[in-house]
């Protein structure tokens, strides 16, 4: 089936791989004045892969969510306190993200923030407006054990 895989390392190298069973496209990070980010949603965002998107637009506004992320970083709303301001972004404070109140059969499964400096993951399981972001140290612990 189709999928998006987000890859990043501690050095700041990051990409998204948009995949179908027969084709893949590696999408580079988006670079802004205050750094680079990768973002993935429930659809393909590269022009090359859009024709292979099986959702045919029935993707719960994933392109709108993707645009909200890019706009928030390009406008420098996300700066200084990256973790805190990114939590606000994912809660929908800067535009549409996960506000599916009128969709009884669709919910956000989780929202994640990856801190490449500390190798810590912050994750809200469920709607980030209702669920707290908790620290997930599994990656950090795995690397520390070596």
Annotated model-derived regions:
Residues 3-146:
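C-terminal, well-structured catalytic/ligand-binding subdomain of enzymes
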């Amino acid at each position: 089936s189709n999928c998006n895989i987000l890859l990043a390392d501690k050095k700041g190298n990051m990409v998204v791989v948009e995949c179908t069973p027969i084709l893949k496209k590696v999408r580079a990070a988006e670079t802004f004045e205050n750094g680079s980010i990768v973002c993935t949603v429930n659809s393909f965002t590269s022009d090359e892969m859009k024709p292979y998107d099986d959702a045919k637009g029935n993707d719960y506004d994933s392109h709108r969510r993707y645009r909200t992320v890019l706009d928030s970083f390009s406008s420098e709303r996300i700066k200084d306190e990256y973790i805190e301001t990114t939590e606000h972004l994912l809660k929908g404070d800067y535009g549409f993200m996960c506000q599916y109140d009128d969709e009884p059969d669709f919910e956000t499964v989780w929202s994640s923030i990856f801190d490449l400096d500390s190798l810590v993951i912050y994750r809200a399981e469920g709607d980030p407006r209702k669920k707290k972001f908790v620290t997930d140290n599994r990656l950090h612990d795995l690397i520390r054990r070596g």
